């Protein structure tokens, strides 16, 4: 499974619709967790059926695509099954009891509810949330893959905007010929690693480099009045600085 990510661009009304879809996905997941807590013996199929009940009782839940509702129920069951596995294995300490999600930043669609343009430069979400057509910008080329190979589409919200992730079902084969050489690695804190040939790679310390900026940005947020626009702006800037440090670590 390959995951390709593109930056999405849309109007302000579309961004509001994306926020609404993400909140609805969070509501469905938390409702499934509550059902599992209240009714003993609730299984995965029961959570899938409960999605239809939520759609019938809540109009905003009915606006979300049916497969997107099922994907949210699968997220709830994933946390439940993880808790069951930890209990069966007898892991010491906390077992990871399913918790209600407070901050949700993504909504996942399966094979329906969206349509990719022929030029692969835009995607249209056609459920009742009103997201509509979003422009895509990225370095990956989706022309190499068929539409039926795209099994999941995620809308992910970050500090610097909205991203669209495509989960593509493809088998990767890499012909790797062994060289016959052996090497030893010593991973440390001062140096990132030192191999047996004497090569030393320094620790980049991305968090330490941007720590002063992060602390200063956090102080700016703390000094602002709660609920004010200035606090919202400072909070967004702080999120972008955190995202900048994370992206540097991933790109290295």
Q: Over which residues does each language-model region extend?
A:
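Nucleic-acid substrate recognition interfaces
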Residues: 1-252
